[in-house]
Amino acid sequence: MFLGLDSHNYPMRTYGDIAFRVYGTPVRHGLNILQSIQLLCNVGVIIIANGQALSQVSKFHLCYAICCLVFALAGFMIGQVRTLQKYGWFANAAIWMNVFIIITSMGVVAHSGPNYIAVGGSAGAALGGLSVTPDANGNFPPIVHSAGLPPSTQGFIGAVDGLMQAVYAYGGAMLFTEFMSEMKRPRDFWKGMICAQGFIYIVYIFYGCFLYGYQGQYTVNPSFQGVSPYAWQTVGNVIGFLSALIAAGLYGNIGIKVLYNNIFTDFLGAPLLSTKKGKIIWAAFVPVYWSAAFIIAAAIPNFFGLTSLVAALCILQFTYTFPPMLFLGYKIRLGAVLEGEGFNPLTGIVTRHDGGIKRILRGYFKHFLMNTWHLIFFLGSLVTAALGAYSAIMSLIIAFRNPQVTAFTCHSPLDST
């Protein structure tokens, strides 16, 4: 779709531009708003993870809400970077930081037990907590594994939440257009994306299976916070802090651009970011954006529940629901074109011989099998999103029944003592 709709005179810059050219302005605004929400929540999720990391490094002596605030304040500074090109070297460094964390985490979990203090953030806790609850003598249940759906006291909620974690980890189509439009050599991005997806898929699958094999239901998300030796916890948390700050800066950069270019500029008449006034507004808006992300993080101190909710409501849509929906409309428009129709670049006039349901059906049946497949894919993705959203909301409701889990709490989600 990008190659078919992009042009030198009318370049594609955002995900919403695809929706605009296929379905019109209302759908474009809807996608831009949802994209802004996702990017804001992504920054919030990263603040939660690093708030947990800082609280773990401080051995839970520092208030959890303050830990989140420290990371948000760091975001005030890194958020002042306006162009994605300046993130290139930092993003590359972040990859190798994460690889280092993966290697060290695997080495540590292979020679030590799970982090029982952090069972509140474990996979077993998301399944009702029965498999990670100690007995009267304080002995924790043995490590167990499940080849199919794991046993749960909450029905299918925990299993669907686990599925949403996979969606959160692998879903990334939302930023495709933004990266393509900002890179001077799009073919390099295309090759880089394929290599990155292959690398991520292989590493994530192996790493996930490895940690689950050694820690079972005690596996924590983020995983490096589930290692038991404090020294290696600190190594992973400090390096993860730096890596996450780069990722949060990237998400915040694109999130602010989407908000500014598609809401402030279109609806409020704000000046372009390339102007002096635009740069001043950017500098002033960055703290506001990060403050909103901090409020989300501190108000919902449940990493597993929030990531599941963001995955179901946002990431799943941009990766699995919207692509077949957009491609279906794109193919219908192409298939409906009759001889003599088209756009005249000299006059700016679009010629069409008919319209309405007749035109839509003609376009649909032109590529019947492909269009039917994308329609089924779209509907299936909607059902999965509904199940994911329901499960995530129920998980958060159950989590907040715990008196220690409150908004803006000082008690770290990883401290189960």
Language model features by range: what are they?
Residues R82-W89, N302-L306:
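Membrane-interface helix caps and helix-loop-helix hairpins in membrane proteins
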Residues M1, A72-Q80:
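Central hydrophobic cores of alpha-helical transmembrane segments in multi-pass inner-membrane proteins
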Residues F2-N32, G44-C67, A94, T104-I315, ...:
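Membrane-interfacial loop- and helix-cap regions that link adjacent transmembrane helices
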Residues G75, N98, I315-F322:
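Alpha-helical transmembrane segments and their membrane-interface exit regions
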